[in-house]
Regions:
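Non-catalytic architectural context of zinc metalloproteases
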Residues: 8, 28-37, 41-198
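Short linear S-[DN]-x-LW-Φ motif typified by the pepsin-like aspartic protease active-site region
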Residues: 16, 26-27
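Early extracytoplasmic/domain-onset interaction patches
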Residues: 1-21
Length: 199
């Protein structure tokens, strides 16, 4: 993961947070252990940082004079077995949950933090999300600028095997599967879903 965070002139310390209160969870359960190899840069200069000893989801980064942005680089280690947590990535499918693989600056309402998301998918994969303004260049996908709150509420489903049904009313059903034969749906089931949209 690579994330660029602008900094105001004169900033000497930037605190970045990994979300701990996640949509659909009833407690502070952000997957901190899945964030590894965390590094920060201003240009080519590697920056010093430390994790807060009390607020463990906070990372304090020392910002050099004149820096206009800080680049965070890290790896999100998705669970490989169900005993490690929900499996969200396989060789054929992806459920990209932004809140588990992004940081945000402390001291701001998340609905006011502007972001421009970009993802590079494996060749031939198709993405689906509630984000607006999708454009593709090869296997690189970019969406229109949005706020961090909307980003977190807009996971991406993508996969090698993908199918989409128009349910009417500007509503689509997007399906990804491990195998192409698993993409099928009975016409009567699609009709029921279309009826729900009409209701």
């Amino acid at each position: 993961m690579t994330q660029t965070v602008p900094v105001a002139p004169g900033t000497t310390r930037l605190t970045l947070l990994l979300p701990q209160w996640l949509p659909g969870n009833h407690g502070p359960r952000g997957p901190l252990a899945e964030l590894v190899d965390l590094q920060f840069f201003a240009g080519s200069q590697k920056l010093t940082w430390k994790r807060d000893p009390v607020e463990v989801y906070a990372f304090h980064v020392d910002v050099p004079a004149g820096a206009k942005e800080v680049v965070a680089k890290f790896i999100h280690t998705s669970p490989l077995q169900s005993t490690e947590g929900r499996i969200t990535m396989t060789q054929e499918m992806l459920n990209l949950q932004w809140e588990k693989m992004s940081l945000y600056p402390a001291g701001h309402y998340v609905r006011r933090i502007r972001v421009k998301p970009t993802v590079t998918l494996p060749q031939g994969w198709t993405p689906a999300t509630a984000l607006d303004g999708m454009s593709m260049s090869g296997n690189r996908v970019t969406w229109a600028e949005t706020d961090y709150e909307t980003l977190v509420d807009s996971p991406i489903f993508a996969g090698k095997y993908f199918r989409q049904w128009d349910l009417g009313g500007k509503t689509t059903l997007n399906v990804v599967a491990d195998e192409p034969e698993l993409l099928g749906a009975r016409p009567e089931n699609i009709a029921k879903l279309s009826a729900l949209v009409e209701e």
